[in-house]
Amino acid sequence: MSRFMHFYKSPVPLVLQAHKKNCLVYTNLRTRRLRLLAQLNQREKELKNQDFRVGHEKVINTIDEIRTFLVDNHDDIIESIDGVIRTLRDIRPNEQVSSSTTTGHNNTTGTPTQSVVSGTGAVTGTGGTSSVAPDANMVADKTVTITMADKPFEYRDSFRDEFIATMYNATLRSYTMGDWYSKLKQKIYDEERYRRRFKVTHPESPAISYELVCGQVQILDLVTVYPTTDIVITDIQSAICILWTLYNGILNTTLDLSVTFEEVFEKVPGMLDVLEAEIKKENGNTTLFGTYSFADNEDIVFYNPPKDKRYSPRTFENNVIVRLLYRLRCIQNMPNDPLGAAAQSNLGIGWDEDRLFRVCRKLLTGIVQDVPIFLHKQYYLRSGCTCISALLYVKCFLDSTSVFSPSDRKFSLDTFLPNANTYVDASDYRGRNIKNFSFLWKKYVTQLYKDRPSITFSGIFPGAVLFSIAYSVSNNWLGPGHVQRPHPNARTVKLQLLHNQPLYSYLWVQHRVPRHPLEVLKAHDRALFYFEYGIHLLLNQPISFTTHRNTLKRQFNVTDVYELCYFFVLGFVPVELII
């Protein structure tokens, strides 16, 4: 064996770390590259998120600016849209006249033109001779009359809106509308956004701006309009059905189902006379005293029960109208009476035997497809009874004095309508058989309903709603559940909350940006509760103008029944302010 190894054999085995240089260096570079790419992607995402947040904030700010602009310039925008609509209406008949004239001219060389009848006129031509009939699609002027001492008013779209516009366009002078509107102006002046929205300046001045009047009248119009989609008939329509059922029951006549809704609508003053006489007969005196409100729970928030369409037990138990319906057998049992409902079910009596449902099914044909059952969907029963109570109060109040009686009134249509020529003479005073409400119903209410069948009580008499709510507040009523009136001989004096202003709260949430529908519904229902209980309080007072004359004169510039008619219709009485 040789002591030396061959040259090609290494005497010491080489042991090297695997991939010591190349692969490890390559791995470090790859990891660093991946780390840098991840950081770059993360930074890119952060920049995108930052740009998104900035863009989102810009969009939100832009939306808020648009909302503020729309709220502040709502009336101007609506007026501009109405102006465009009126312009288009005026252009359309002119185009038809031009086309008709051109057609007649082209027919001069041909056969004689035929006779064309459309609407109330006709176009008859032979050869080149033609006479153009008025367009049947033209919107005719509508007329309403408020009192027997005035001329009729002509309007195109909305009587109240056009009356306000005419009043403020007539002169450059300002108008005052009583202490109530002055207090409202002072409250709004403290809010900068509403101050700009309603153009409120100089809070110490009693002058009321055009924007503030329109905003408040709009709120009054919405008090009895329930802002949910499940309401299919109005309070006026519900009241007409209940009134016709009571009218036939009081007179002990066979239920007349051969009439239409429009025919019954025109008979409302006579039906209210019969109802008034029946309530006075039941009371045994000449008053209408009774319970016209409803026994709600203290925790009630919404006027319309949201779940099962029923109110709590005994809500309708003491109401005068509902008890009269039950006494005359117009309804089979009292609402929410399980014993009566079970007894009727055991006897096999269905809804076809219910007189009120039969009347609703007949009168509401063509108005609504699915006629509601008032004892099930009790909102209609409650709103209808409240509307009847309100109509009864308005009728008795307006018929307490003649519009021709002399007074020291300051309101005059001649101030802004030079051709009004109001005829009021003391020699024409009639103390008996006063029919102010019947005249107003025929010349004003009926015309408004024909023009807009969806109108409600607050849209017809916003002033009555305003006075009712103000009367509830002045009597220290705190809302549903607090139904006890302060007794004159009580040992304690009941105080009221400082911010007990339901109409101002409703106005505030209605024009707030952004608007919260639930808060709007709560404020609306609170105002509706106050209106309902105010009617109850007013009907439990002697119904005459002298009873509330001082309050009406101080709060709303109403000095006699003539001005009261305009106050109920307009929601205000403007008196020219001379500085």
UniProtKB/Swiss-Prot annotation:
Protein name: Capsid vertex component 2
Pfam families for the chain: Herpes_UL25
Chief location bin: virion
Subcellular location: Virion; Host nucleus
Single GO biological process annotation from the record: viral genome packaging
InterPro entries, sorted: Herpes_UL25
Signal peptide (UniProt feature, chain positions): none
Assembly: Heterodimerizes with CVC1. Interacts with major capsid protein/MCP and triplex capsid protein 1/TRX1 at the pentamer vertices. Interacts with the large tegument protein/LTP.
Record region (Interaction with major capsid protein/MCP): 1-46
Region ranges (Disordered): 92-134
Keyword DNA repair appears in the UniProt entry: no
Annotated GO CC locations: host cell; host cell nucleus; viral capsid
UniProt keyword annotations, A-Z: Capsid protein, Host nucleus, Host-virus interaction, Viral genome packaging, Viral penetration into host nucleus, Viral release from host cell, Virion, Virus entry into host cell
Bias (Low complexity): 101-121
Family: Belongs to the herpesviridae CVC2 protein family.
Taxonomic source organism: Elephantid herpesvirus 1 (isolate Asian elephant/Berlin/Kiba/1998) (EIHV-1)
Biological role stated in the UniProt entry: Capsid vertex-specific component that plays a role during viral DNA encapsidation, assuring correct genome cleavage and presumably stabilizing capsids that contain full-length viral genomes. Participates in the interaction between the capsid and the tegument through interaction with the large tegument protein/LTP.
